[in-house]
Each structure stands twice: as C-alpha cells, then as structure tokens.
C-alpha cells in the first residue's frame, strides 16, 4: 500500500485530464474548471465598478465561495450560474475562455503570467491572505510546478472541457426553442448554494483537499439535517470510493462512508468503514500530534464506544456490551471522564429494561452536569422523563423536568434537543390521553424555525423529531375523521422522508395503522387482514394485536383468544403497560361477545387498576366505558349510567370520533334499559333523550365512515320510533337499515353484545 501512496502523491500524474501537483506540498491542482473560475475572477477585477451594479456584484461575491470550495462542475452549468448573477460578465467569461481554448498554448501561458499582476501595486486588486488571494496563489504555484508535457495535457483537457460545454449549451438552446418553460429557467435557491448533485460529481475529477473537505462536510450536514438533499447512497459511496482511491488515509471519508452505510442498514460495510476511520485517525497522527500518546488511546476508546453504539443500533446487544466494556476499561486507564460519561449513557440504553436502570440514569445526569456536558445531561433528563412517564408519574412533575431541560437547550443553543423535547411532550400528552395538548405541541414544533443554518430557504431540519411530530399529527387527524388532512400530512411525510431514509419507518407504520383503522371501520376485514403483515414487519407487537382484532371481528373467537393470551404474557414481560391494557380490553370483549360477561369483569378491573396506577387517563375512561357496558349486559343499567357520567367527559373532550360515538350509543342503550321501569310519560321522555343521543352517535360514526355501527344505530332508532308511535321516522330509519344491511355482511352477533 505504501508504494501506491508514493506513486500517487510524489509523482505528479494525469488522470482524466486532471494534472496533480504534490499533494503533501500544495494539496491542490489545476483543472480546466479552475481555469474557468480564474477567468471569472480576472474578468471581475477588470470590470469597472460602474459596469456592474451593486446588486450584481453582491450576487457574484455570494457565488464565489461555493465555486472555490465545491467540486468541479460542467462549463454550461458554470455559465448558467454566472448568467443568473450577472449576464454581462457571463458573456465576457464565455468569450475569454473561447479565445483561450481555440487559440494556442501560449494564450494559457500568458493568462497565468498575468494573474500575478493582481497582487502588484500599492493597492492590489486582491489581498494575498484573502480567500480569493489564497486560491490565486495556490493555482499559480500549482501551475508553475508543472512540466511542459503536463502543461500540454492541461491545455488539451481545457479544449475538451470547452467543447463539451459548447455541445451542452447548443442542446439546451434547442430544448428551449421547442419547449420554453419559465419555471425551469428560474434558478432555485438551492442552486445558488451550488449544492452537490449527482451529475456534477460524475463530471468532476479527483477533488483537492479543500474540495474534499467541503464535499464531506456538506454531505455529512445533509445526512444529519435533510437526507433528501444528500446524494443517493450508491452515488455517495461511488464518490467516496473515488476519494479513497486517491487518498486511502483520508479518515473523514471513511467516517462518511460509515454514515452512508448506516442509511442502507449494511452492518458489515458500516463496521468496516468505522474501524478504518479510527485506524486512519491513528495512522495520520491527527490525534497523537496534538495530544502525544494520549491521542492514540483516545482514538482507541472512542472507537470501542462507537462500535458499541453501532452494534446497539442493529440490535446486537451482546456485542455492544463487550465493546462498551472495552471502552470503559481504556477510559478508566486514561482517566477520561467525558468518555466514561458517554459509556454510562450507553450502559443505560443497553440495560433500560432492568429495574435499577433509573438509578444508573440519575447518576449519569448528575455526573454530566458536574463535568459540564450539557448535551449528555439534557439527553439524560429526557430519558429519565420518558422512563418516569411509563412508570406513571404525574404530568406536572414530568413537564417541570422538561422545563429544566429546555433551559439547558436554550442556554447552549442545542436546537436538536429543543426539537426532541417538544416531540417528547407531544408523545407524553398522547400517552396520557390529552389529544388537544398533544396537537398543540406538535404544531408548535412544526411552526418553529431551526436555530442551525440548513440551506437557503429551508427553515427546518428533517430530523426524527419532525417525523415523530408529523406522525402524531396524522394520527390525531385520522382519529377525528379528518382523513383528507391526514393524507396530506402523510404525503408531506413521504416527500420529506423518502422510503429509503432512516426515519421512513415511522410514517410507514403510521400510514399502515390509519389504513387498518379505516378498513375496520368500513367492515372490510379482508383488507385489514392484508395490512397486518406490513404492520408486523414494522412493529411485531402492534401487528399481533391487530391480527387478533381482525380475528375477533371475523368471529374467530378461539384463535383471537389464543393470540391475545400469548401477547398478554409477552407484554407483561416487557412491561408494555399501554398494550397490556389494550389486550385486557380486547379479551374482555371476547368474553361478553361469547355471552360470558361475568368472566370479563376481572379483566376490566385489572385494566382499570393499571390505567389508574400509570395515570393513563384516556385508557382509564375507555375501561370504565367497557365496565358500564358489562353492567348493562348484567342487567343493572342504572349503575352503568352513573359509571358513564364518570368516563364520558374525557372521551368527549379528547377522545377519537369512534370512541365518542360508542360512548353516546352506550348512553342511549342505558337510557332505554333504565326506562323500562318508568311510568309512561317519563318513559317517553327518556326514549326521546335516547334518540337524541343516537343521532349524535350516528353523526360521529358517519365522520369515520363506520357503516356497521350506523346500521346498529338506525336499527335501534327504528325500534324506539316504533315504541313512540312515530311511523314516518320509523320507516325512514328502517329503509336506511335495510340498505346498509344489504350492503354489509351480518355476523349474527346480538346488538346488546356489541359495544
């Protein structure tokens, strides 16, 4: 490998028309594109202040930095960029390059000789230490180092570069004549940033060190903040391989390769790139030069720590624990408290299912504050809040803790953690069943602008927090029957987080769940069953639960019961309280649909106790709703009504539309059952009130297109109208019932046994 390095760096060579200078000395080389940029700079200095307006000069100055730092682009693209900033100068540059390319070699020689004049005089046009001055000096020095044969090859490459640009310009002109699209001629804001696109990368030769550093930092920033604007995984890997071919010891390129491989879940390649990164970091002496032998040890312990994080991401917990132990051992030997704090945080992640994990987390937060590590301290507080939320702590205490965390965020401008904090508040309010508060927090996050500079015109980062908030927003709209709005949110999610991005699984699961609920509401159980496979692939527990729900709806009670019992045991082991309560409610429904309401009562009481203990208000209200229904079946409607008064307020305030309809339908059933013992005037009044509640329930069910429940409601209304002697209203409801009954399948379940 060493011989390859020597042939690459110490013997200047020509590859694809690009002349390399001594990389260790100059770390830059002359290319046809850079000659074109030099022509632009020369023309700018020759053009008087009156010839170019102040606005045009400002646009040109903004354009220069990305042109100097970015990779080589085609000549036609360069013309277009200059023309958008200053059309007059673009014409001058085009003429100058044409004269040079169609002239003789001495024209290029003379051009480089004249460049030195920019620094002469008492008031030079360009300062030597400025960005432009350094670029000019690098190019002059790199050109002066070339042999005659290399100069000739460079001139040949310039001619080829010009000819390719001319061909492209002619093709674009022909296309404009055939179809003139005003929108395409306008430059987008991201084009002003000269962001690296695939066609630009493919046309460029080997990058200089500055170009490579700019390319890597730009792509790393895009992968973190807006993955959709980064190169595709295949294109990025191709460019990184090209970089590493010319400089195998470029450590940062190996790290970006590691991040790129994580995008496609390639565990082998990502591990390979990560290990190469730390190997090259040690070999190049980047750490040891500044820190002596300490730098070598630092690389080793952070290599082990990153390896542990990588294994944890892929679910290899045993390997992650071994790597973490190695990192802790090396950090303790070096007395590196910062590394030990990171290790402590990862220890919590690996052992968070243990009963004593909160002690570890509290210790981690205290130590992080002590050593002045606000990022780790804040992450620890948020993890602690999440753990306490699942443990059933009160919302006010959790919000106070998050407020303390937010103070750290704003004090240290940790914008990423501000987003995470708001997304966490959204999730906590939904966990507690307060959909209005969750909606408010989600909208707050989406209306916030990022504190970090992303791209021109982009105010937000495409991070996990935004994906979580948008998913909550879609689900909340779907719960309220606003399916068109939910579809718009999901459409935005798909555009913002494409299927191959790392956070795409969030919206995929959200989309599948919404489709499943709609299919169940519409009575299309075969369609719902087909969606279960997709849900299971994304979340196995959710998938098994949904499968049981479908089986139950299809009257396959024994299969549903077996599945729910297995799921109950599994969720109790995992301490997934929310799912345990949902499973208990489903099992209870199985029992009363099998005409065994007395067996359902212990299940419901257990679910109520859990929801009260963990302060899951909405699930508690739903459990009370089920208890009231059980009491109705057992023949005590008065007690059922009194129970309903306890549960109905949270459901009407924060519940899903379907649950609101179920609650009002149950109230009507209880009113009718209670009215049996009333005298005639009072009974008629109670039945009228029941009909009003049934109308409200029908409106709720209509919003979510739940035809089966609408059929049950109109059947019940027809019976009540018949009792009250209202023939016309009875006939209208009976006709509607008949239409729905012919359209929908009937499973023969008695109406009284269906909540």
Swiss-Prot record:
Gene3D superfamilies: Tetratricopeptide repeat domain. Changing residue 617 to H: In a breast cancer sample; somatic mutation. Pathway: Protein modification; protein ubiquitination. Signal peptide: none annotated. Pfam families: ANAPC5, Apc5_N. Keywords: Cell cycle, Cell division, Cytoplasm, Cytoskeleton, Mitosis, Nucleus, Phosphoprotein, Repeat, TPR repeat, Ubl conjugation pathway. It is found in: Nucleus; Cytoplasm, Cytoskeleton, Spindle. SMART domains: TPR. TPR repeats lie at residues 209-249, 250-300, 301-337, 338-378, 379-418, 419-466, 467-500, 501-540, 541-580, 581-620, 621-660, 661-696, 697-736. The keyword Nucleus applies. The modification Phosphoserine is found at residue 195. The mammalian APC/C is composed at least of 14 distinct subunits ANAPC1, ANAPC2, CDC27/APC3, ANAPC4, ANAPC5, CDC16/APC6, ANAPC7, CDC23/APC8, ANAPC10, ANAPC11, CDC26/APC12, ANAPC13, ANAPC15 and ANAPC16 that assemble into a complex of at least 19 chains with a combined molecular mass of around 1.2 MDa; APC/C interacts with FZR1 and FBXO5. Component of the anaphase promoting complex/cyclosome (APC/C), a cell cycle-regulated E3 ubiquitin ligase that controls progression through mitosis and the G1 phase of the cell cycle. The APC/C complex acts by mediating ubiquitination and subsequent degradation of target proteins: it mainly mediates the formation of 'Lys-11'-linked polyubiquitin chains and, to a lower extent, the formation of 'Lys-48'- and 'Lys-63'-linked polyubiquitin chains. The APC/C complex catalyzes assembly of branched 'Lys-11'-/'Lys-48'-linked branched ubiquitin chains on target proteins. The TPR repeats are six to seven residues longer than a canonical TPR motif. This is Anaphase-promoting complex subunit 5. It comes from Homo sapiens.
């Amino acid at each position: 490998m060493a011989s390859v390095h020597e042939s690459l760096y110490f013997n200047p060579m020509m590859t694809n028309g690009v002349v390399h200078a001594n990389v260790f000395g100059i770390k830059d080389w002359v290319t046809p594109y850079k000659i074109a940029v030099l022509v632009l700079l020369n023309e700018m200095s020759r053009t008087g202040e009156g010839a170019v307006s102040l606005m045009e000069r400002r646009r040109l100055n903004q354009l220069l930095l990305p042109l100097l730092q970015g990779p080589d682009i085609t000549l036609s693209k360069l013309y277009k960029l200059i023309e958008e900033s200053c059309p007059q100068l673009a014409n001058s540059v085009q003429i100058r390059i044409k004269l040079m390319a169609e002239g003789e070699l001495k024209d290029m020689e003379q051009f480089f000789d004249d460049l030195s004049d920019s620094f002469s005089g008492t008031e030079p046009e360009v300062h030597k230490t400025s960005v432009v001055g350094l670029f000019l000096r690098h190019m002059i020095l790199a050109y002066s180092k070339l042999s005659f044969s290399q100069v000739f090859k460079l001139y040949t490459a310039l001619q080829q570069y010009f000819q390719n640009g001319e061909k492209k310009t002619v093709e674009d002109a022909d296309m404009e004549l055939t179809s003139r699209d005003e929108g395409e001629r306008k430059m987008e804001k991201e084009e002003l940033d000269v962001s690296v696109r695939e066609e630009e990368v493919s046309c460029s030769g080997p990058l200089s060190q500055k170009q490579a550093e700019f390319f890597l930092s730009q792509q790393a920033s895009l992968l973190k903040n807006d993955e959709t604007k980064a190169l595709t995984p295949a294109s990025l890997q191709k460019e990184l391989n090209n970089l590493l071919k010319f400089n195998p010891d470029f450590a940062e390129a190996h790290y970006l390769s590691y991040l790129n491989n994580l995008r496609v879940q390639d565990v082998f390649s990502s591990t390979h790139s990560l290990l190469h990164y730390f190997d090259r970091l040690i070999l190049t002496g980047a750490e040891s030069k500044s820190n002596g032998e300490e730098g070598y040890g630092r690389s080793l312990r952070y290599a082990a720590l990153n390896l542990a994080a990588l294994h944890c991401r892929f679910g290899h917990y045993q390997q992650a624990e071994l790597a973490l132990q190695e990192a802790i051992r090396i950090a303790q030997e070096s007395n590196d408290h910062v590394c030990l704090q990171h290790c402590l945080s990862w220890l919590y992640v690996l052992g968070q299912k243990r009963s004593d994990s909160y002690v570890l987390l509290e210790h981690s937060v205290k130590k992080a504050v002590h050593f002045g590590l606000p990022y780790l301290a804040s992450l620890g507080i948020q993890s602690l809040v999440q753990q306490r939320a699942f443990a059933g702590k009160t919302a006010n205490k959790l919000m106070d803790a998050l407020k303390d965390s937010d103070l750290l965020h704003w004090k240290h401008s940790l914008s990423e953690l501000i987003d995470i904090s708001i997304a966490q508040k959204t999730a906590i309010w939904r966990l507690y069943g307060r959909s209005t508060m969750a909606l408010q927090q989600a909208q707050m996050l989406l209306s916030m602008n990022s504190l970090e500079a992303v791209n021109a015109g982009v105010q937000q980062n495409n991070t996990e927090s935004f994906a979580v908030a948008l998913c909550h927003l879609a689900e909340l709209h779907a719960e309220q029957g606003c399916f068109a709005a939910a579809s718009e949110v999901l459409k935005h999610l798909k555009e913002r987080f494409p299927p191959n991005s790392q956070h795409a699984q969030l919206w995929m699961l959200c989309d599948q769940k919404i489709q499943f609920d709609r299919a169940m509401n519409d009575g299309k159980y075969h369609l719902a069953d087909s969606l279960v496979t997709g849900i299971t692939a994304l979340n196995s527990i959710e998938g098994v639960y949904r499968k049981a729900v479908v089986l139950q709806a299809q009257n396959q009670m024994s299969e549903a019961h077996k599945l729910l019992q297995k799921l109950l045991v599994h969720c109790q082991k995992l301490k997934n309280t929310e799912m345990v309560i949902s499973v208990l409610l489903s099992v209870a429904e199985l029992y009363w649909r099998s005409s065994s309401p007395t067996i359902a009562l212990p299940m419901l009481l257990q679910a109520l106790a859990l929801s009260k203990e963990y302060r899951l208000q909405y699930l508690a209200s739903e459990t009370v709703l089920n208890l009231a229904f059980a009491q109705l079946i057992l023949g005590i409607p008065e007690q059922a009504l009194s129970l309903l008064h306890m549960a109905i307020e949270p459901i009407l305030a924060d519940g899903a539309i379907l649950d609101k309809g179920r609650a009002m339908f149950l109230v009507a059933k209880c009113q009718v059952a209670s009215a049996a013992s009333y005298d005639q005037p009072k009974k008629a009044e109670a039945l009228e009130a029941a009909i009003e509640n049934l109308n409200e329930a029908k409106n709720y069910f209509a919003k979510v297109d739940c035809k089966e429940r609408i059929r049950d409601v109109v059947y019940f209304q027809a019976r009540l109208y018949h009792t009250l002697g209202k023939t016309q209203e009875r006939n209208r409801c009976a006709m509607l019932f008949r239409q729905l009954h012919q359209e929908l399948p009937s499973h023969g379940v008695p109406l009284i046994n269906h909540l």
